[in-house]
Amino acid sequence: MNTSENKKIQKVLITAGPTYERIDPVRFIGNYSSGKMGIALAEECLNRGMEVELVLGPVNEFVYRNLNSPLLHITHIESARQMYEACMEIYPKMDAAILCAAVADFTPETTADQKIKRKGEMMIRLVPTQD
């Protein structure tokens, strides 16, 4: 970003971290994204005086603990659907978006309300997440 572009961009949406797709209350499908790239981008935008709306998947608090600014708002999410819904609500108010979260491509078609007991094989039907 050069200086002339910074004057145009005052509010930015950034997505970061993984999403977890629930199988049952104790199991999920996820990935190893740390969220560090999105956190670094948020920090740079804050350093340039931009307001940052950070939609953050389940990451270790250690990764973002030093990210502190009155220009920062963090929305914590868990699933791809939650990330989609948060972004759809926030994005219309933004000047730009940086989408670097590791969003799941698939989610279980159904989820169990109780822990699934271990008995033989388990088949999980996956359906695409919403883009």
Predicted regions and their residues:
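A cross-family phosphate/adenosyl-ligand binding-site feature
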Residues: 1-131
